[in-house]
Amino acid sequence: MSITIFLLLCVFGLNQAATLKIMNGTECQRNSQPWQVGLFEGNNLRCGGVLIDRRWVLTAAHCSGSRYWVRLGEHSLSQLDWTEQIRRSGFSVTYPSYQGSLKSHEHDLRLLRLGLPVRLTRGVQTLPLPSTCVTAGTECHISGWGTTNHPWNPYPDRLQCLDLPIVSDDTCHAVYPGRITENMVCAGGIAGQDACQGDSGGPLVCGGVLQGLVSWGSVGPCGQNGIPGVYTKVCKYTDWIRMVIRNN
């Protein structure tokens, strides 16, 4: 099957019940998040991800599918944007200390190598890794396809963005006692505004730099007041990420 035909099938055959994601976001400006990745199994959107190299995508370790169709340069999921690129994921590397989400959410990151490098265009770009860790109070943003955790709300067709502040470690520890480690960063806690299931692995972007990956949050409904989302703290893993890319 040609890539063009497959792309058409993906665009018009998306299963809209696949996932639930950004709550109360607004439509992103087209091509403003060119590093945003959608990880699909067939027509089902499973997770988000972020392009950090022409051949490498970073996502959450609990996005554990063996192979994905990796869609880049997307804005609308039902119409051709003419910026789309599709790759097949192959080789993947999960952080060695990750124990699985049933035991611990720590070290929740995974690298996917694409079968072919992407072409860098206005709609497909890499996002830089951080050189320092983000501080509390910094305004950041997340992105993804979806609205709320209520199934009667319409599944958004276009990429959604949401601004969220970084929450202090003390505040996050108070909300999740005994569960937050130095390898996690919290953001949000504003009523009705959050990432949610299916956004996993998507980017938390602060000042044009990747600072987090959507990882976990409240057990109950997403977007509860005073309960921030928890993200993998990417600044703690940059040496490992670069080593994997360099050696593979």
Residue ranges of predicted features:
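Extracellular "complement/coagulation-type" protease architecture
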Residues: M1-N248
